[in-house]
Structures are given as structure tokens and as C-alpha cells.
């Protein structure tokens, strides 16, 4: 994918070129002096596209986040780069790919979630602790960790089965299941708000959060 076409959608994973890291360190001396960030760069681990500030959006910068593991304080490092600093751009890992990194106690619920996504035509992708543990090999998961998922917004006739299926699995799973349904443009709504049939929901976009009607979100995504 050409760098100029790199998406700025939330939940996108990117890696930086060597020149991109050098530019990021030159722009922010505190970032350059952080040994945890330096180690991240040396390993070539991905970063995740986050919501942009108004200044970042106006400047056309790509807003990124780096969630450091609990062993170094579980800090969330924010930076932004030019589009030509990106080496690769890709989706979050699929649930099927990361399942082996999850605790044994989670496995039955994960299999149910995979089957639910397949029935509804929308495979689950993973962010949060499970994703970062799989991506980096570092320990992120703990006894109180949630499972963070995103699903593409399904066809209208499959929306209720997906939401109600998530609620049923969440009710019996050993971990809390959190996450969003995403439109094609990357805007997302927490699945619990949609499952509760609230008339208005919090829509998270690339640049902010706004209250919209649930119907507007689901209809505009198709």
C-alpha cells in the first residue's frame, strides 16, 4: 500500500521505517530518551492508530499509540508521525490467530466468539492486552484482564443475533468482553450500547466522540 494512501482509521496497526523512528526521536527528546520506547523501536513492534487531536488532524499527522506492558508500568505512549514514516499498515490480528496466547480458561468463550462471528459473517479482531501479548511476546494479560474485540458492522438481519450472542457469551465467560462494532470508515460504537437498544450511542471517530442515534450509526455503515 502506498504511504500516501495510509489510512488513519482507529484500530489500524502500523510499523515505522528506520527513518520514521529517527524523525520521531528527533521531534521528541523525551521519547528518544525513554529506554522502553527505544526497545520497542529496536524490535520493530507495531503501533496502533488512535484518535487524533485537532492539531494532529489539521497537520495531517498519523496519531499513534504504544501501550507498554505492565512490567514497565503499563504506560500509554502517544506520538504522531508523517504518513511517509509508515513501513507497513494492516488490520488488528484476527481472534483465530491470537487464541493460542490466551489463558486456558478463556478458550471455550473464544471458540464461541469465533463461531458467532462466522455465523454473522463478521470475523472478530482483537486489540488490548491479548493482542499486544501476541504481537510482542511480552506479558500483558493478568487475572483481571478484559477481552477487547472489534467486529465489522454486519448486515441488518445479522445485527441483533450478533449483539445478543455477544451478551450471552459475555454473561458466562470468565472475562469481560469489551469492544466495538466498526463501520467501513472506522467509526465505532461499543457493542453494549447497541445491545441495550439505546436510542443514542457514543460514536467514536478518527477525530472525536459524538452522540448520534443508533439508527444513524447502523444505517450509515452500509
Residue ranges and their predicted role:
Residues 80, 84-87, 194, 198-217:
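Mature, function-bearing regions of proteins
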Residues 113-147, 151-157:
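Active-site nucleotide-donor binding segment shared across nucleotidyl transfer reactions
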Amino acid at each position: 500500500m502506498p504511504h500516501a494512501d495510509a489510512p488513519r482509521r482507529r484500530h489500524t496497526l502500523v510499523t515505522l521505517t528506520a527513518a520514521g523512528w529517527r524523525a520521531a526521536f528527533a521531534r521528541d527528546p523525551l521519547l528518544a530518551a525513554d529506554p522502553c520506547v527505544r526497545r520497542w523501536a529496536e524490535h520493530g513492534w507495531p503501533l496502533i492508530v488512535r484518535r487524533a487531536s485537532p492539531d494532529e488532524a489539521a497537520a495531517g499527522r498519523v496519531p499513534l499509540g504504544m501501550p507498554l506492558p505492565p512490567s514497565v508500568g503499563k504506560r500509554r505512549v502517544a506520538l504522531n508521525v508523517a504518513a511517509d514514516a509508515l513501513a507497513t499498515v494492516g488490520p488488528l490480528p484476527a481472534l483465530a490467530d491470537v487464541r493460542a496466547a490466551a489463558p486456558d480458561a478463556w478458550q471455550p468463550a473464544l471458540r464461541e466468539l469465533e463461531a458467532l462471528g462466522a455465523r454473522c459473517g463478521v470475523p472478530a479482531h482483537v486489540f488490548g492486552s491479548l493482542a499486544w501479548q501476541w504481537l510482542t511476546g511480552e506479558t500483558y494479560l493478568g487475572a483481571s484482564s478484559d477481552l477487547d474485540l472489534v467486529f465489522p458492522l454486519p448486515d441488518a438481519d445479522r445485527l441483533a443475533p450478533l449483539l445478543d450472542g455477544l451478551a450471552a457469551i459475555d454473561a458466562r465467560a470468565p472475562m469481560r468482553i469489551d469492544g466495538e462494532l466498526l463501520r467501513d470508515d472506522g467509526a465505532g460504537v461499543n457493542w453494549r450500547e447497541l445491545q441495550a437498544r439505546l436510542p443514542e450511542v457514543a460514536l467514536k471517530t478518527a477525530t472525536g466522540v459524538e452522540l448520534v442515534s443508533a439508527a444513524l450509526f447502523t444505517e450509515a455503515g452500509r
